[in-house]
């Protein structure tokens, strides 16, 4: 987390000046979940669109039309134009460069490598790559337009707004969360993240959980005693599991752990690119 200023306040990342301290973005579960969602959904829509144009143009892949072409990847009978690999590279570059602007040169390098590899492997010709790149960028633009208006830029609030959230919780419930650091940080990370546009859930109220037990109530005390018992008798296995999920520096945060599980299952079950994209999107 960013270090405090001399006056005890805390700086926030600025997407308009991502290289200024603290660097933008400051990766945390809400931001990571949003990035994964846009990236995966864009890939999925891009592949659906690719299949539409593959069978509209229905141009055979070059290696199927010319038996003299040597290939270095498994063959298939799909139409070659536009290249699905080029589409994935282009749409991924577009979305990830917007989400992680300080990494855009590295991301561009990887996208170029991906697209070149398809030609080096004999799977695509230049026009397949060009068509796929154009399609991927077009789909990426649609998703970037959504991201620009989804309300995320208002999720991180200035101190007066975060203080008002704290005061509202105190007035309504009789308690509020307090940061234990010195100097004290404002209320939470992106406290208005709940206002960001939802993907499929109609509204947050439709999935609202029951309220938590009040501090010092019997239910609260039972839960606190259980937690203290765990802490007093923590096993090595429990500690290892807790560290895995701890969302520390250098991790891809809890949302990324689940993407990792999904990718491992995709490989294990030998899913094709369409099914893999669908898994990650949903």
Regions found by a protein language model. Name each.
Residues 1-282:
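Acidic/polar surface patches and capping/hinge elements
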């Amino acid at each position: 987390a960013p270090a405090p200023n001399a006056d005890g306040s805390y700086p926030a990342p600025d997407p308009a000046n991502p290289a200024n301290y603290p660097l933008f973005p400051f990766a945390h579960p809400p931001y990571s979940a949003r990035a994964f969602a846009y990236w995966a959904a864009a890939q999925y829509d891009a592949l659906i669109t690719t299949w539409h144009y593959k069978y509209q143009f229905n141009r055979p892949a070059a290696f199927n039309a010319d038996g003299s072409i040597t290939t270095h990847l498994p063959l298939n009978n799909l139409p070659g134009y536009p290249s699905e690999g080029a589409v994935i590279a282009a749409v991924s570059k577009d979305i990830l460069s917007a989400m992680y602007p300080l990494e855009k040169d590295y991301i561009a390098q990887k996208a170029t490598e991906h697209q070149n590899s398809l030609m080096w492997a004999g799977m695509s010709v230049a026009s397949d790559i060009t068509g796929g790149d154009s399609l991927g960028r077009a789909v990426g633009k649609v998703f970037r337009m959504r991201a620009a208006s989804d309300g995320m830029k208002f999720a991180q609030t200035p101190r007066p707004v975060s203080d008002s959230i704290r005061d509202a919780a105190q007035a309504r419930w009789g308690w509020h969360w307090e940061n234990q650091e010195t100097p004290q940080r404002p209320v939470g990370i992106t406290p208005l993240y709940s206002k960001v546009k939802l993907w499929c859930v109609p509204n947050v109220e439709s999935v609202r959980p029951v309220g938590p037990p009040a501090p010092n109530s019997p239910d609260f005390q039972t839960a606190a005693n259980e937690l203290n018992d765990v802490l007093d008798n923590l096993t090595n296995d429990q500690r290892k599991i807790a560290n895995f999920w701890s969302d520390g520096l250098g991790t891809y945060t809890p949302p990324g752990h689940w993407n990792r599980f999904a990718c491992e299952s995709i490989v294990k079950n030998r899913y094709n690119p369409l099914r893999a994209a669908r898994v990650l999107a949903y």
